[in-house]
Amino acid sequence: MSTLKTPFRYDFVGSFLRPEKLKAAKKAFEEGTITKEELDRVTDECVTEIVAKQKVAGFHAITDGEFRRKFWHLDFMWGFEGVAHEKDGGGVQFNGEMADLEATYLVGKVKAKAHPFVEYFKFLKQFEDEQTVAKYTIPAPAQMYQQMIVPQNIGQTRKFYVTDEELIEDIGKAYQDVIKQFYAAGCCNLQLDDCTWGAIVGDAAKQRYQSLGVDIEEVKARLLKVNNLALENRPEDMVITSHICRGNYHSTFFTSGPYDSVADYVFAQEHVDALLLEYDDERSGGFAPLAKVSPDKKVVLGLITTKKPELEDKDKVIARIHEAAKYIPLDRLCLSPQCGFASCEIGNKLTEEQQWAKLALVKEIAEEVWK
């Protein structure tokens, strides 16, 4: 069992572009020309291959590339009691493109059960060695809470939960159970992917909530509450990090805005060990909010974009790292791409070769900065 802990000086978020072999197998399965067992065999092969590539690239964290899921977040929610989904009706408008998502909603109280993702983790864990550790990525509890209170779901949710507080309580407890399942399977490095904070940054979000008569500070308090409730009673030697995202679908984004308005909550008060933060362009604002990060957290700067194939200027990235170090000590900083390469099956608009070139640049820069 590996004793390595994330994050590393050079790291990555988790998802990778799906190989053509896997895409073809999933299409064949959907068309009914291969069995589930045959699809699983191809998926196992592809996970084995992506882990090998991560090791060859010199990275210490290994993931399954999220190859076993269609969406970075929804598939995980389907693993709880009380949650149902259907193919149509879940589309979300991104910047210039409609994301084709599945409708995911409540049909009962949220409860934990034996979660299929734990079995996926067990397959990944076999590849750990002295130089690598398996990291598993799941959506943050706040993401599940947000999913169940969006306009198209709130009416259905109210059939089972009269108040948001009751919903938060059940989601938090269900996550506690699943976190313990991961730990029992040997997982000591878990990452919570969270678009909820990114969705409420900036003036546009504030104005949107004001128009609905909703106190945005109360929204922030609830997001913090459900995330921290889920982390109560976690194993002491389990590292849990959070990736704060503004949406990533086919190289488009969902929201824009600096971290200033949420830093007092997620940076200062969320009980995670590290924050993986998007900082690849001006949509993320400046580094000043990093001064709010509590001293027990590390920060992974997502300075290399996964949305575009062009490589960043190395010297400019190094300069930005040192700029960030004005607000948080350099020894608490790490480097990664700003997000995954394929948050959903469709993936971003770059090739596999360009994907690995991005990661090589991350490693090269980190080794120069933290000699």
Each PLM stretch: what is its role?
Residues M1-K371:
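Domain-level signal for soluble alpha/beta catalytic cores
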